[in-house]
Amino acid sequence: VAETASCEGVDYVRLGTTLDGQSIDCLEMGEGDVQVWLYARQHPGETQAEWWMEGAIECLTDPADPVARALRKACRIHIVPNCNPDGSRRGHLRTNAVGTNLNREWADPTPERSPEVLAIRNRMDQTGVDFAMDVHADEAIPAVFIAGFDGIPSWTEAQGDGYDRYQRILDRRTPDFQT
């Protein structure tokens, strides 16, 4: 995080602190109006998700990469490489310091159970969200996969169209994508 925060055009934002007192880190870059959020390791045992995030950060901060330059010009990108530093440090597989599965807290996060999600949601409320990717991993699946938003009451047809479009693009662009 410190190395990336020192890159030109990257801002470090401390979103808050965890129950163990660790920083909830966010890296922000880009100058566009489209608000893009990438976040990983709500489940700390999914270390591959952070590896993916490291690759995404490396790509997005590469001044020689024309796609990254275009994205930074069109978007404001917010990256939380590790949503659950307490769980990561403690060696937990799915929970934070008090045993909360952060992935289940988004509807009603609290400072006592899920300050990590609360801090991220507060920042999302400030910036807005046009695209969000919650990066997970499964050591038993040797491919990239995405899961949709089935069952979310506020889901719109426009969001569904965007999701389907993204899935088609991902399928065309990477042989590692599992459909």
Per-segment meaning from a language model:
Residues V1-D11:
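Non-catalytic propeptide/linker segments at domain boundaries
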Residues G9-D25, E31-D176:
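Active-site/substrate-binding loop(s) of hydrolase catalytic cores
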